[in-house]
Amino acid sequence: MEQSCEEEKEPEPQKNIQETKQVDDEDAELIFVGVEHVNEDAELIFVGVTSNSKPVVSNILNRVTPGSWSRRKKYDHLRKDTARKLQPKSHETVTSEAVTVLPASQLESRSTDSPIIIEPLSKPDYRNSSPQVVPNNSSELPSPLITFTDSLHHPVSTALSVGGINESPRVSKQLSTFEVNSINPKRAKLRDGIIEGNSSASFPSDTFHTMNTQQSTPSNNVHTSLSHVQNGAPFPAAFPKDNIHFKPINTNLDRANELAKTDILSLTSQNKTFDPKKENPIVLLSDFYYGQHKGEGQPEQKTHTTFKCLSCVKVLKNVKFMNHVKHHLEFEKQRNDSWENHTTCQHCHRQFPTPFQLQCHIENVHTAQEPSTVCKICELSFETDQVLLQHMKDHHKPGEMPYVCQVCHYRSSVFADVETHFRTCHENTKNLLCPFCLKIFKTATPYMCHYRGHWGKSAHQCSKCRLQFLTFKEKMEHKTQCHQMFKKPKQLEGLPPETKVTIQVSLEPLQPGSVDVASITVSTSDSEPSLPRSKSKISKKSH
């Protein structure tokens, strides 16, 4: 009889004297399975671990083997004696539950088919009427078990102790919900049912099911903890402080809610981690391509120099003399009644193929109050804003100011600004300005000869502005030196190279029926000034 008792007490007494380790390992992961508060009769609750292939059959709870009653009776007395020996004196006064939980490293090495037994620590007169759960294979007996013990004398407060395989004195430590979560910072936390962080579960593909009996004591001060792990995702469950009472959890509903929240969180994280393409800064065309430069800023000394006309022998000051010469040459040209008179613009002196095109040019460019589809540098009109923007991108640079006053180096993107500047700032001086190429003369005779040359000869028209030159060399020097970015727009200051900028004619569509605003995207690297060509190469080309 004694020999049979020794054979029967192999598995569980060894489990009760297992070593308990301090729960301070950073890699340890606590998995709370369930606690049962029993007043009279305790039932053994089997927590099944389903493998990847087949779930555990729950009929094992109802399995009855021959001689099981005698084994339970004998083992009950042995377990009571062992519990009395192992229980410290202070255990009667401490109102806590000792929960033995394996570290994560041991849980990972444990076979997925090993059972987990939850059993109460009973009084000496405690009667165990539930069937004993025996492992399937004898080789699994030494495998670590998770044991939940529960005090029946006092209100319950949770205490967790980590047990190891080797034998050592038992260490118990009361832990709050915050301490349990702070043991392993990698462990997932639940707040308001939303998963925070990634859970490093030991069984990513297994499913843990906890079967609890209905208790008559209601639960108070329930806190959220991790008691279920399904397919690697944690579920919120009740973690009590005073009384223990678990209700059945609708896993299907919780799973659906958890999946929906996970989808929302994944979309939010994608929006945060994904770096979307930033919107390009919007700059108006007038601010990006047009500008003015005041030059030296010092007014020229007034000399009140007079100039004598070679045709009518009139003596006039510089500005009036310039107007007088213009009227003389226009009158002479009109008397010839040539075809050029009907196709040349009297404002910009540009020639057009037909008089109709000349008339359209005058109406769109020189008579319109505020033309929106006109390039102010070229003084040419375009059909739409989009065509104008494309023209500006292909032919001009940001801050391009090709019209220069050669007296004080005043610059502008608009020819009329330079002409007005000369007539106001350089009036009554010794300088004469050519309206075709902005060249400066000091005497009347060379000025009138130069002026007649522009009328009589086929001038070299600059393809990027309205200026005309008598020689090809002068035209190329002008294009190389003046058609560059003279001043960087304020909107581009501080922007790194290769920055994309959106150019628009206006912020709102000008036409009532249109919805979209015409725009074009340019790179700041395209606006960098190019090196001017040497004069020697230009002179060779002119010959």
Swiss-Prot record:
Residues 1-23, 105-138, 518-543 are annotated as: Disordered. The keyword Oxidoreductase does not apply. It is found in: Nucleus. Residues 1-10 have a biased composition (Acidic residues). A zinc finger (C2H2-type) spans 343-366, 373-396, 432-454, 460-483. Gene3D superfamilies: Classic Zinc Finger (3.30.160.60). One of its GO terms (biological process) is regulation of DNA-templated transcription. The modification Phosphoserine is found at S68, S70. PROSITE patterns: ZINC_FINGER_C2H2_1, ZINC_FINGER_C2H2_2. The modification N-acetylmethionine is found at M1. There is a cross-link at K173, K247, K261 (Glycyl lysine isopeptide (Lys-Gly) (interchain with G-Cter in SUMO2)). Its main location: nucleus. Residues 534-543 have a biased composition (Basic residues). One of its GO terms (molecular function) is DNA-binding transcription factor activity, RNA polymerase II-specific. The keyword NADP does not apply. It comes from the Eukaryota. One of its GO terms (cellular component) is nucleus. Keywords: Acetylation, DNA-binding, Isopeptide bond, Metal-binding, Nucleus, Phosphoprotein, Repeat, Transcription, Transcription regulation, Ubl conjugation, Zinc, Zinc-finger. Residues 128-138 have a biased composition (Low complexity). SUPFAM superfamilies: beta-beta-alpha zinc fingers. May function as a transcription factor. This is Zinc finger protein 280B. It comes from Homo sapiens. The gene is ZNF280B.
